[in-house]
Amino acid sequence: CYTMKVNRRTAIKITAAGVSSFALTPDFFAASEAAEPFGKKYPQLDSLTTGEWWKKGAGAKTQLKGRGRKAAAPPMDVPRDQVMAFAVYTHQAGVLKMTAQLYPLKPGEERLARLEFKRDGEWVEVKKSEVRYPGWYAHFRVENWDDSQDVPYRVRHGAKAMFEGRIRRDPSSKNEIIVANLSCNSSRTAGGRPEIVANVMEQDPDLLFFGGDQTYRHTEHTVGWIEFGMQFRDIIRDRPTIC
């Protein structure tokens, strides 16, 4: 991990890429709830977060990059008040974009995520979004965003699960901004990243840029993405993040 200073013009070009999201067609989502949403030829893909995932148990080992390399996966069956894992966001030209990531949901659980902002001391719901399968994520887009002020937010699921953070104002008064540049997050090293997170917090960057290889779990992509987000959630919760 390292930080760098970039001028505002360069930063605008970077953030135009948007936030950790990609477009999928409606036909793709027609596979919703399928035990093998990627087809019978690829039963190993996302096997720990699709189908009857809760029966798979904790501690399953997943294939990593490189022949014969495996590592235990983090548990996906978490307490239901903890299913809202994390969220990433960017904003530019009056548009706020956010992607909330949930742990896998069980049959009968609500498939909606809710975005709230704190205004005048009160939490106000502004958007609802479908939780997509496979992947267990929800996208939010807010138009006419006032980027001149910090705004507390939280993303909720059900009655108790939530992830809170802060939408930072646009640092337009700065001639230079600080960008934290991180990459190559090993999946062989389980657990948190407390030293990295603490050092990044000390730098207090305006923008986080994860340049690639957020996970090396090459068949369990959702597990790897959730693992990465949980490792860095305390720095991504209150600043724009590009992955």
Where do the protein language model's features map onto the residues?
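Secretory targeting signals
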Residues: C1-V6
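Generic low-polarity alpha-helical segments
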Residues: R8-A11, A30-A34, I167, T241
